[in-house]
């Protein structure tokens, strides 16, 4: 990967070992994905918003970075955190949480604690390059907003937030944003979460193009969140609705789809029947993305 003279100086340790380690992480990631260079980002979103013992390496790096006086160089938001003030078990499992949050805030991170950062605090524009690490936010940014981000991992996300840079590969490139699976909808009563769950299973890490449907913002959020959870989908298109799918040829980037699927009402109903809440269920936990008043 080709670095600028400034980036090379950081890598060589001019600004201290902590910043050099951050640059080394991005260079290794870029080399792994054959990225030709590092490019500036508009914002970052972190997943490391909670402290448990298994993420020891991440916390040690975070402490070193704070001790060195480094701060994030772009607007940076955070995923949800545990409700340690309410649950006794959380006060044990996440006993270092308050100190962890103090470190993050010392870095200049916005303490929003939400995976729907794109609704407030961290709202990108079409074409913005991001370094986000929450899968449900990543798919929404790519698909609904038309911003560009890969799905980043813990530790790499904080390095990108500090340097304000990301390796140029994957969904940052035009050639990787085209649809690969054409999805026809034969549905009378739309169930966006069920549809997303099915498509995640069927598409895995491929990008689907759906027939036109007037999804609401909440439905698009839940559609994408379910795809990212049941599969590895990072982007989807809805014909005539999402910004990079004004027509079929544009969404497919002029290529024939690898596969064509038809999702029917029976498919959605069967999924609900198989995965529905049973009568003797004592508790239901709802995860990301968070619900709204709508």
Enumerate the language-model features and the residues they cover.
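Non-transmembrane, aqueous-exposed alpha-helical and coiled segments at domain scale
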Residues: 1-294
């Amino acid at each position: 990967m080709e670095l600028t003279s400034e980036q090379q100086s950081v890598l060589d340790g001019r600004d201290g070992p902590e910043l050099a380690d951050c640059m080394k992480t991005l260079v290794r990631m870029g080399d792994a994905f054959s990225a030709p260079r590092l490019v500036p980002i508009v914002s970052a979103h972190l997943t490391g918003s909670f402290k448990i013992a298994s993420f020891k390496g991440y916390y040690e790096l975070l402490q070193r970075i704070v001790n060195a006086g480094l701060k994030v160089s772009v607007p940076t938001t955070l995923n949800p955190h545990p409700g340690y003030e309410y649950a006794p078990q959380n006060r044990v499992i996440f006993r270092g949480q308050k100190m962890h949050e103090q470190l993050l805030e010392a870095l200049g991170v916005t303490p929003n604690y939400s995976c729907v950062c794109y609704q407030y605090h961290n709202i990108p524009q079409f074409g913005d390059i991001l370094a986000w690490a929450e899968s449900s936010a990543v798919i929404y940014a790519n698909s609904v907003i038309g911003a560009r981000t890969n799905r980043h991992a813990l530790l790499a996300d904080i390095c990108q937030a500090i340097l304000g840079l990301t390796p140029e590969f994957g969904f940052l490139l035009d050639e990787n944003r085209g649809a690969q699976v054409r999805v026809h909808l034969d549905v009378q009563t739309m169930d966006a979460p069920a549809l997303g769950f099915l498509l995640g299973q069927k598409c895995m890490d491929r990008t689907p193009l759906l027939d036109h449907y007037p999804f609401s913002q909440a439905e698009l959020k839940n559609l994408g969140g379910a795809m990212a959870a049941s599969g590895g989908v990072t982007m989807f298109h809805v014909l005539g609705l999402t910004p990079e799918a004004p027509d079929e040829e544009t969404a497919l980037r002029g290529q024939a789809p690898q596969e064509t699927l038809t999702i029917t009402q029976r498919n959605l109903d069967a999924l609900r029947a198989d995965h529905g809440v049973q009568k003797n269920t004592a508790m239901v936990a709802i995860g990301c993305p968070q619900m709204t008043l709508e």
